[in-house]
Structures are given as C-alpha cells and as structure tokens.
C-alpha cells in the first residue's frame, strides 16, 4: 500500500494547502567521542554558541516508550544518575506516575560533549494520547527537529501517523527510531518497511534502540546533534520570545516557559506582551534541568522559564509574543485553540469550598489551556462551573489532578457534547448544557450532533469485533485498507457522543489491547436527539438531566431510576421516581413508605382504637406526600453521577 492510499486523509486534514515534499533525514557524520556531562548548566549554556543548540521533541503513539527513552538520555547527559529502577523523571505529575502515561509535555535542557565541543540539548517529552494532541502542537513550535518513536513490537499506530504529520507540517527534521528491539516479539524489518511505505522515510536512516537497556541510545544522541539543525535567530536583535507553556507557583505566581527567538532575556528586564500590551518586570530566568535552575540570561535559540510578576493566570496566553519595553517586533501567529469535545457541569461537594475550588480550577486551566471554564448554576446543586475537555481521558486526568495537587473533589454531571439546534425561525445555536435543551420536539426544527472521523489501526484478526463495535455505536464505515499483511486500517464516521462514552476502552477490550485510534472533527449531522429528565415526587432534578439519542432513552431511563432508587433513603410516605422525555413519563420506580407501627402500645381494649390510629396514619402520610419535599443528600448525587 502506498502513502497516498493510507494517509491521504491525514494529508487533507493537516497539510491542506502545503506542497507535497519527501521527508528524509540528513545524512550521518562521524561517531562521537565519549560524553562528558557538565553539572553547571546555567554557566555552560551562557557560553554555548547558537550553532551548538538543538531543540527537539520525542513524538509517538501512547506507550511506545517516550518517557523511558528520556530517562536513558538524561542518564547519558549526566542530568540524573543511572538507576535500575523505573524512574520516568519527566513524568512529574502523580497522575502520570500512577497511570503510567504522559499527559503534560515536559522540558529538560542538557549539556552534552560531542567531538570536543559542548552542545545544549533541549528535550521536550510529549504525550501520546489523542486527548493531549494540543500539548504536542505547542511543543513542536519550539523545535527544529523531532524523534519519531515507534514500538518495534506493535508498529505504526494511529497517533504515530497523526503526530508525524504535525511535525511534517512544521517542516521539522524527523529522525525515525524503533524502540523495544530487545523484546523477543520485536519485528524491526516489518516496522521499517511500514516507515518506508506509509511515510516515505528512508529505512537506512532509522535507528534501532532499546530505551529499557540503553542499547544504541548514545548513537541516537549523536544523530540528534548531526541531523537536527540549529535555531535560526539573531543574537544582536531586540528581544523576541514566544510563550509555549505556563504553570502556577503558590509563592511566585505565574511561571512561563519561553522560546527565545531573537536577542536575549535577562533578570530585571522590563518586557511587554505584543498582543495585550501588558508590561512585566522579569524577576528570574533559568533552565528546566528537569527542575528549575536559575541562570543569568536566556540567549537566542534557548528554551527556559521566566518569573515575571504575572499574578493573573488569564494574562498568560500561549503563543503570545513578548519583547522589551520601548521596542517593537512583529507578533508570532500564535497557537490555534482547540475546541472542547465533551462538557460537564462541576459543583463543590461542600458549598463553602467554592472560592478555594475556583482558584484551583483556574490554576489547572493555566497549566492546560485546552480546558474550557465557565461559571454555571443549578437549582439543585447551586453555583458551579461548566467545564469543557478534549476527551474523556482528558476529563478523568483533570479530576485526578484536582484531587492530587489541590486536595479537592467535585461533583461532576454526565458528560455531554455540543449540539447544534435549528429553531423554527431559522436561527441556530449551540447547546451543550442539558438544562438549556428544549423539552418538546415542537420547539425546534432540527437537531444536529457532532460527528468524528475515526481512524482505527489494529491486527487484522480483530476486523469482525471492531466492525461490530463501530456498528453498535451508530457508526458508518468510510474506508477499509491494510497497513501491511498483519494490520488493518478502518475509517468510520461516528457520533462524537459515542466516541466519548468509553469507546476507546471497548476498542482495547475487543482487540486485546492492540487497537489504537485517531480522530478529527467531521462537522455535524442531523440526528434524533432528545432530552431525558428525572423527577422525584414530581419535582424535576436539573442536575440529573442528560441529552442522548432516542434509541438509548428507554434503556438509560430504566437503569438510572433503579440506581437512583437504591440510593435515596425511604421516607414515611411513598416516593415516586420518574423519567420524562418530551413531556411524557416513560419509566417509573417507586420507593415504598417506611412503616411505623402506631398500634405498638395498644395491648388490648376496643379494636376501634387501633382502627382510628391506622386511619390517622394513612391521612398523615397522604398529607406528607402532598406537601412534603424529599430532601436528597449531596452524597446521593455524588454516588449516582460517579457510578454513571
């Protein structure tokens, strides 16, 4: 299969308008001398010329060994000590260590001696999951080259292709590297053939390494120095730097990670944003090594952090250009903001925690600019937020980080996607909050749901189960091809709502962990979408409302009512739980009344005494049912929404 047959969709998505050109890495030169690591990076970097700077990233599909390879490189450059343990130094977040995945791009500057010259190597370790593709995009903006890492046991997978074309579109030098060659299941020859067939990369330029044992990693560092070009910049020009990442420090405020395009950045300098015109005084600059190391200056071509007295996280706009006060430079294009694909409502478990929780959410959003944050309110749960994410894993990681880093837990409603509604008067609007979705079909002319063009890569023996999975999710097959004799590529048009509803886990299950996917927005398509509401004793509970396809309404309603019935405690009167769709009750569960024995103290006497007590009890329960409100504890909502 040729490049055009397999990757034409990716070319159309990412390279539209670019001229086709072959991608070949530069030829290798002489082998290096033994590395002599330098400890004081701040002092050494100040004397390294621009021609000896290399800015590069590692890109790959998830679980292909990026973080482990980074550890071996850090060991060889003297940044960390050699260890037989599993370190994953650049995976700094506890959620990354716990899950074993990279969710946040991390930078590390290193000094390496090659042919008796010192080189400054700036490494960026990027995530491999599709939900964090924006991190890859921002990272590549600071690089001149990248390592395309491919698992020799699995071959090219969906995100391998997507990340390749992100680097290709930026005209970066791409070094193909096969990892895990020490495993008995490795098939390097087959994977090399895939690299030639899919990407038109010269197999002779590929390097075979083992990030676990460190085999051929020194040769890889040499190849980076030989093949990745140095930054093109003017050291004597006015300062010009671009913000590529930011995070919040409790004591220092907003810290930025910048790439110096021209000139130099020193502590004490007065700078301003070319876009917002806000001014800042630089308190400190330095390198990530991988922890912050203070330096006197950041020179042209270098990547480092800056502490600049920025207190408001909203002022740190990724892609923003900065220069010295009194100078004028042309602003860089900036980064295109990705639109959220899944939304949830979030509320504090304890309402008094709202202010501190709001600060924590803002600080996390500063570190991950793909998160959408908007204040929202609920009649049931009070004031909260409307949050948007790039996928279900993105949402899950956000909640974990909120708990790990800020000790906060939130009550999160069922995820929804944005729907496009055409009203009777011809006007259209986007609705992602179930509370804003119309109850009756007569209120609107048409509802359209977002679609995703999904590319799935998996072993060919799982074609049947994968096709059945896609069909059960209302998918429409677009293409079917074979990457090789052993790997199949399916392209399906799927509703975004089904893709976000555990589809990736189901794919992994039916392919025994060997399936992968990549997707892109495919516009909107008309669909039979309705709102499902829940009532307790006739009172609507807005926090439980959801939007879904009509085919799933009855099944979802019955299952939800049964779960809700098991969570709400019994009252002294009968409680009706109902599910309503388009103003019609479609399902019901009843919580029977808790019986109190009012005749317990009647040990004898006239039977009419007992009858009178029972009659009074029935009338009292009738009044309670008519006028009483069921008070639902916050924990009931938490248990219900977490299990759903």
UniProtKB/Swiss-Prot annotation:
GTP binds at residues 60-67, 125-129, 179-182. Transmembrane segments: none annotated. One of its GO terms (biological process) is translation. The keyword Membrane applies. The keyword Nucleotidyltransferase does not apply. It holds the Pfam family LepA_C. Keywords: GTP-binding, Hydrolase, Membrane, Mitochondrion, Mitochondrion inner membrane, Nucleotide-binding, Protein biosynthesis, Transit peptide. It is a peripheral membrane protein. It comes from the Eukaryota. One of its GO terms (cellular component) is mitochondrial inner membrane. It is found in: Mitochondrion inner membrane. It catalyses: GTP + H2O = GDP + phosphate + H(+). Its EC number is 3.6.5.-. GO terms for molecular function: GTP binding; GTPase activity; mitochondrial ribosome binding. Residues 1-31 form a transit peptide. Belongs to the TRAFAC class translation factor GTPase superfamily. Classic translation factor GTPase family. LepA subfamily. Promotes mitochondrial protein synthesis. May act as a fidelity factor of the translation reaction, by catalyzing a one-codon backward translocation of tRNAs on improperly translocated ribosomes. Binds to mitochondrial ribosomes in a GTP-dependent manner. NCBIfam families: lepA, small_GTP. This is Translation factor guf1, mitochondrial. The gene is guf1.
